[in-house]
C-alpha cells in the first residue's frame, strides 16, 4: 500500500486535474447571488464557525465563492498569512465553495459543516471539529490527523499511510471506506460541557452591531 500511495502522490502533485465537481457547477448555475473572492489565494488553513457550509474542491486555480449575499448576512470573511476564517451566525447556513490547491488544515466549530467534492490528494491534512460540527472528508494523504470534540461527527473515506486521531467522549467517526497503514487513536479528556453554539446566549441584533 505504501508504494501505491507514493505513486499516487507523484502523479497527483505533478498534475492536478482542473475539472471541477458538478456540485460547484450546479451551484453557479442555480444561484447568481454570490460573491467570488478572487483575491483569496494560497490558502493552507481554513477555519469556519457559526453556521457555515463549506464545500472543498481540489483545484490548481484557487477561488472562493460565498453564496446568498454574505454582506447582507453580516458574515465575516478574513484572510491572513495563508489562513482563511469564515463565520456566520444566521439560522440559514452560509454556503462557501472553496477551490483550493494544497490545504493542510481545516477546522469547523458550532453547527458548521465541511464536505469534499471529488478526491483530494494531499501530503498532510489536519481536521479539527468542535461543538456540533460535521464533516465528510474523502482524501488520500500521507499523514492525516483528526481532533473530534463535543458531539461533532466525522465521516472519512480514502486512505493514508499514518493516521492519528483524538476522539472526544461524545464525538463520532465513521471509517467504513477508509484505510490506514498505521493508526493511533486516543480519547480526549472531558474538560467542559460542549456548546453547540458558543454564541447562543448572545442575541443576533448584538452580533450584527459588531460588523
Show where each model-derived region lies.
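Intrinsically disordered, low-complexity terminal regions
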Residues: 1-130, 134-149, 153-211
